[in-house]
Each structure stands twice: as structure tokens, then as C-alpha cells.
Amino acid sequence: RWLLYGALVSAALVGSGKMSIAIGADQASCGSGADWPLWQAFVERHIQSDGRVIDHATERLHSTSEGQSYAMVFALIAHDRTRFEQLWRWSVANLLGNRLGTQLPAWQWGRRDDGSWGVIDANSASDADLWFVYALAEAGRLWQQPQYTQDALTMLELIVADEVVDLPGLGPMLLPGRSGFATIPQQ
């Protein structure tokens, strides 16, 4: 019961600057990711210049909120600010439809059945949503970018509103996504 609130409160505290989480290397020693060959290989293979992370293992060459958010964490660790911004901007434009503050990111984007490109599944994925919050909060703190911190807090509010339910006998629980997941009826 308190684990969920602990995680959400921790993310909020990180975002507000009241708590910090070590990334594993300080900013000065990270450079721009050029000294992390595996990050560079991932970027070259999976990330388009506009910030879209492509899953080449899928027929639709789709992108997911998980791929975008995990890549943002790796960009943060690599201190690759340019790539981080590209990843976030692509996510906001395509997974959020430029509606940060009113919806959570769609979990899947790619080639639709009719051949057009766009959101394939608009449902959210709470694991990715929390990684977005973490990456944004830490980027706001490390790079002194208050807009990232604000974006993290905005997403956190939506996570609590859209993905947390009160389960009788258990208390607040984080669902895997915004819709399509059964909960125990209230008695």
C-alpha cells in the first residue's frame, strides 16, 4: 500500500528538488555520451534524428512509450542533453499529441493497418510513465531546467489521477495502464 505512494512521493520530491537520486556518475565525468560506446551503438541503431526510438524487431517498426522513456534515462546517464531533448520532444508531439497535462503518453506508435503512421494503441503504460517522470525530474535537477521538473510533476499528477485505483483491502494500486485492466468492484 505505501510502496506505491512512496515511489510517487519520491518522484515528486526529486522533481521538486527536495531529494536527489544518484545517477551513477556525476555530470562532469559523463560528457555527451561519446565515451559510452554502447549508448552510441544504441543511438545509431534505434534512434532517428528527430528522437524517435524504433523497434526494428517488429513488422510495423513501432515505437513505444517504454522505448522512449528508457532511452531518456540512458541519455540522462550519458549526459546527452541534445538527444534527451529530441527524445522528449518526439514523445510529446507523437505519444502525447502535444497534450501534456491532459493525457498520458500512448504506449504504441507506428505504421497503422491503413499504411499511415501514428498512434496504434492510445492506452498508457504506467512503467514507462514513471520512467518519464524520473528522467524528467532528474534532468530538471541535474541540468537546472525547471521546465523538465514541471513536466515531471504534470505527468505525476496524471499518473495518480488516471492509473492509480483504490483496491478494497489493499489500498491504492498502480495499474499497468489507464484502461482495460479489471479491478475488484467496491462493496
Annotate each predicted stretch with a short phrase.
Residues 11-14, 137:
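Residue-level signal for alpha-helical transmembrane segments in multi-pass membrane proteins
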Residues 67-83, 90-93, 130-145:
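Well-ordered alpha-helical scaffold segments within catalytic/enzyme domains
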Residues 87, 101-143, 148:
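Long, hydrophobic/aromatic-enriched structural stretches that serve as scaffold segments
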